[in-house]
Swiss-Prot record:
PANTHER family tied to this protein: LARGE RIBOSOMAL SUBUNIT PROTEIN BL19M, RIBOSOMAL PROTEIN L19
Keywords: Ribonucleoprotein, Ribosomal protein
Lineage: Bacteria, Pseudomonadati, Aquificota, Aquificia, Aquificales
Pfam families per UniProt: Ribosomal_L19
Organism: Sulfurihydrogenibium sp. (strain YO3AOP1)
Superkingdom of origin: Bacteria
Protein name: Large ribosomal subunit protein bL19
Similarity field: Belongs to the bacterial ribosomal protein bL19 family.
Gene: rplS
Tagged with keyword Nucleotide-binding: no
This protein's record includes keyword Methyltransferase: no
UniProt-listed GO biological process terms: translation
GO molecular function: structural constituent of ribosome
Length: 133
């Protein structure tokens, strides 16, 4: 039964979503409807949480705008998300970065992954995908 649910969910998942993890900085292009007009709004921030799987997968993005921290939770299969770009790959050792909320300025920065670390990370994810299915 579980395998059947997974196969059905695959139809509803967007195929053009890049792989990103907690600690990465992402730029989301959101479709916003204001009255009769429709426009694209860009929301760029740090991924502090990823939870769930399949169509129920959500991720939380945090950005600081004019000194005010702002967090938004997005479902991975959200129809208002036009495009997701990974701006930077972050080097973190936690699955949830809630501690970032209490930090200010330079202390809230996440170290960026080196080029060879990104390639290693991609190779590991490819190997795990091949092993799982």
């Amino acid at each position: 039964m579980h395998q059947l649910i997974r196969e059905i969910e695959q139809k509803y998942l967007p195929q053009d979503i890049p792989e990103f993890k907690v600690g990465d900085t992402v730029r989301l292009h959101l479709k916003v409807k204001e009255g009769e007009k429709e426009r694209t709004q860009i929301f760029e921030g740090l991924v502090i949480r990823v939870r769930g799987s399949g169509t129920g997968k959500t991720f939380t993005v945090r950005k600081v705008s004019y000194g005010v921290g702002m967090e938004r939770i997005f479902p991975i299969a959200c129809p208002s998300i036009q495009k997701i770009e990974v701006v930077k790959r972050g080097k973190v050792r936690r699955a949830k970065l809630y501690y970032i909320r209490n930090l200010k300025g330079k202390a809230a920065k996440i170290k960026e992954l080196k080029e060879w670390e990104i390639k290693k990370r991609q190779a590991e994810s490819q190997a795990s995908k091949e092993n799982n299915g």
